[in-house]
């Protein structure tokens, strides 16, 4: 995972956070409460991205 881009879209009381691995073009999307810190939002999205990349390796 060379570089990860984050995109934030507010939807009412929630924020949709997308983490994109630029190397594999894999995307992970999480929906979190709007009150969460940016760091926590990124952490949750990154955890899901890592999970998806590991899952992809085993397939």
Predicted regions located by residue number:
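Charge-rich, low-complexity N-terminal segments
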Residues: 1-31, 35, 39-59
